[in-house]
Regions:
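Generic secondary-structure signature for well-ordered alpha-helical cores
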Residues: 32, 36, 52, 56, ...
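AMP-forming adenylation/ATP pyrophosphatase catalytic core
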Residues: 113-116, 226-233, 238-456
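Conserved short-loop catalytic and cofactor-binding motifs
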Residues: 11, 15, 53, 148, ...
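Alpha-helical scaffold segments in soluble metabolic enzymes
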Residues: 26-29, 64-71, 212, 278-285, ...
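Generic structural signal for well-ordered alpha-helical scaffold segments
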Residues: 2, 73, 214-218, 312
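Domain-level signature for proteins that mediate thiol-based redox and metal-cofactor handling
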Residues: 1-83, 90, 94, 98-108
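Generic structural signal for well-ordered, non-membrane alpha-helical segments
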Residues: 16, 20, 40, 58-62, ...
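ATP-dependent adenylation/nucleotidyltransferase module used to activate substrates
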Residues: 93-257, 277-278, 284
Length: 456
């Protein structure tokens, strides 16, 4: 039981060898009456030392006891309870800090994924004198995925916890699987079912994980949540806005575009001015094993498996014969399901032609895929739905239509700050591959002033 930041009436049910029972008993004794933050610091070595040292063959007992403790702490963290004594309650800051700086001895929470970026964010915060608390979210469990490649899998949680303890900081896990399934995965499946190409990472960042971690940051008495994203926060006369990071090759502001402005004041990005090679060098200099860890290229719930298999298993989208047609409706070939294709796709279409063909559109109802030339693919205007503008539409001078694409010169139809059912975005140059379902990020220079979902 947790109350006023401490653990009480602690007990463990342990089956197995004597070492396992001794390890769990030691954990129960250590944490009964202890502050929750102290319990979150306990790792395998702590348990090992508490029972006088285990032989290598018995060290698994300390692992089992530690895992049981942190599963229990996950339940506490995933509740609405405050995890600190009332005297320490301060809450997160409401003023933005682009670099995540803070006064010495201030407490910050750091979102830790188990990768090098978040590890260095935590390291930099600690070196600046902050009391750091690590937070990891568990979003998806699927035996068919490669947990080692997923950022929010049970395996990633263990890796993040080990990194936090290596840095000497407490660690908590938030279980958001149910919310993630409902608000992200189900909409991902629904998008492909309807013939669009959704962007689940923007949904997750904007609606699920960061808000939950900011809430936990407040409950552990942290002034703000720091993350390892490459992005910047700037402040104008109205308030905070997202902007591009110094490392344009790694800039992740597009993926954060759906964050409400009120959350930006509670976030910090310590890597704003750093490049990826610099981050890896910092990690290597401090002996972190993740310094050379490869980056995941998959969506967290697709790691190690293909999109087709995932949609079949979780969305019931199975192979269904359909026609590949040109813009005049002539049949050029066959396919096995419209959901295997996205607008702008060139490879894997399965149709031979004198010049390269691209996917122009998919029709879920007719189960057809329309292909054509690059010239047919190009667009000079885009209809965007469910638009949120943080500034007046007249401020928009560019738009980004895909994560890895550059921002294009653009203007929007007259619109004031706020929400709009739809807006037309006129492009200053033709863009090939405007995919319905993707996010259109509206920009003023390098600042993000709005976003919406591409409709056509």
């Amino acid at each position: 039981m947790a109350s006023e930041g401490r653990l009480y009436e602690v007990s463990f049910d342990a089956d197995g060898c004597g070492a396992t029972k001794a390890a769990t008993a030691a954990v129960a004794e250590m944490i009964d009456g202890a502050p929750v933050l102290d319990a979150a610091l306990i790792d395998i070595d702590t348990v090992d030392a508490a029972i006088g040292g285990l032989t290598p063959a018995k060290r698994h007992a300390a692992q089992l006891a530690t895992d049981a403790l942190h599963r229990a702490l996950q339940g506490v963290a995933s509740s609405s309870l405050s995890l600190i004594p009332p005297s320490q309650s301060g809450g997160v800051a409401t003023s933005p800090a682009a670099d995540g700086c803070h006064a010495p001895q201030h407490r910050v929470a750091v979102a830790m994924s188990g990768g090098v970026d978040s590890a260095v964010a935590a390291l930099l915060a600690r070196e600046e004198g902050a009391e750091v608390v690590g937070v990891t979210v568990k979003l998806w469990t699927d035996p068919e995925t490669d947990g080692a490649k997923a950022c929010c899998s049970p395996e990633a949680v263990l890796g993040a916890r080990a990194l936090a303890h290596q840095l000497g900081i407490p660690h908590f896990t938030l279980d958001l699987e149910e919310d993630f399934r409902r608000r992200v995965v189900d909409r991902f499946i629904g998008g492909y079912t309807a013939g669009t190409t959704p962007n689940p990472c923007i949904l997750c960042n904007g609606e699920v994980r960061l808000a939950a971690m900011i809430d936990l940051a407040e409950r552990v008495g942290a002034e703000r949540l720091l993350t390892g994203h490459y992005a910047r926060i700037v402040v104008d006369g109205v308030g905070p806005l997202l902007a591009a990071a110094a490392d344009k090759a790694k800039d992740q502001s597009y993926m954060l575009a759906a964050l409400p402005p009120e959350l930006l004041g509670r976030l910090g990005f310590p890597l704003t001015e750093l490049t990826k090679p610099e981050v890896r060098e910092i990690a290597a200099r401090h002996g972190l094993a993740v310094a050379r860890k490869a980056e995941s290229q998959d969506l967290c719930f697709l790691a190690g498996q293909g999109k087709r298999g995932f949609l079949r298993r979780h969305g019931g989208l199975r192979e269904r014969d359909g026609a590949i047609v040109d813009s005049a409706g002539r049949t050029l070939g066959r396919h096995r399901g419209h959901h295997d294709f996205t607008v702008g796709q060139r490879r894997g279409i399965g149709v031979s032609a004198p010049e390269a063909l691209y996917v122009l559109a998919t029709d879920a109802t007719a189960n057809t895929v329309t292909v054509g030339t690059r010239a047919e693919l190009e667009k000079r205007s885009v209809r965007v739905r469910d638009v949120v503008l943080h500034r007046d539409g007249s401020a928009v001078d560019a738009v980004k239509l895909r994560y890895r694409s550059r921002a294009l010169p653009a203007t929007v139809s007259a619109a004031g700050k706020g929400r709009h059912p739809s807006l037309d975005v006129d492009l200053g140059e033709a863009f090939p591959g405007v995919a319905p379902g993707q996010t259109a990020v509206l920009m003023a220079g390098e600042q993000i002033v709005g976003h919406g979902t591409i409709a056509a």
